[in-house]
Amino acid sequence: MEEKMDSKRIENAFFEVIEALGDVEYKEELKDTPKRIADSYKEIFYGIDIDPKEVLTKTFEVNSNELIMEKNMDFYSMCEHHFLPFFGTVCIAYVPNKKIFGFGDILKLIEILSRRPQLQERLTEEIAKYIYEILNCQGVYVVVEAKHLCVTMRGQKKENTKILTTSAKGVFETDSNKKLEVLTLLK
C-alpha cells in the first residue's frame, strides 16, 4: 500500500508549532521532537488509508442465530476536534445470519477505524455499520466507553468523565429483549 502521509510536512509543521510557542527554555531538547512526532503519527494514524472492507474478507459459515459478544476490547484514537487522545473499550454483540468474523478480525476492524482522526460517535457507528453490512447479520449492537483527554486536560478539566456511545442495527433496533440481553451481559 502506498504511503500517503507526508512525514516531512508534518515535521515542518511541528517545528513551526514549537517556534510559535515562544521562548521555550529547553529548545535544544526539542530539536528532534518534530521528527519524533511525524514518526509517531505514522503509527497513530495508520488506519487512514485502509478500507476495512478490503481487510475483512474472511468469514466463517455457522449454523446458529445465537448472540455472539466480544467485550472489553481496548482501543485508542485521536479526537479530531483537538487532536488529543481518547481511549477506552468497545463491546460488540451481534446475531449472525449464517456467517461470522473471527474474533481477531473484529479487533482488526476496531484498530483500523480508531487509528485515524476520529469522533467517538462516528467510531461507534462505523463499527456497527461495517459488521452489519459485511456479515449481513440479523443485528449488531456496539457500545464504546472512552475517556477523552480533551475533557481531562482542557476546558472543564474533569478527570473522571467517561463518554458512552451506542449504535444498534437490525434486531437490536426493534427487539427490546435482544437489547436487554446485551445490556445484562455487559454488567
UniProtKB/Swiss-Prot annotation:
Pathway: Cofactor biosynthesis; 7,8-dihydroneopterin triphosphate biosynthesis; 7,8-dihydroneopterin triphosphate from GTP: step 1/1. The keyword GTP-binding applies. One of its GO terms (cellular component) is cytoplasm. Pfam families: GTP_cyclohydroI (PF01227). Keywords: GTP-binding, Hydrolase, Metal-binding, Nucleotide-binding, One-carbon metabolism, Zinc. The keyword GTP-binding applies. Zn(2+) binds at residues 79, 82, 150. Gene3D superfamilies: 1.10.286.10, 3.30.1130.10. This is GTP cyclohydrolase 1. It comes from Fusobacterium nucleatum subsp. nucleatum (strain ATCC 25586 / DSM 15643 / BCRC 10681 / CIP 101130 / JCM 8532 / KCTC 2640 / LMG 13131 / VPI 4355).
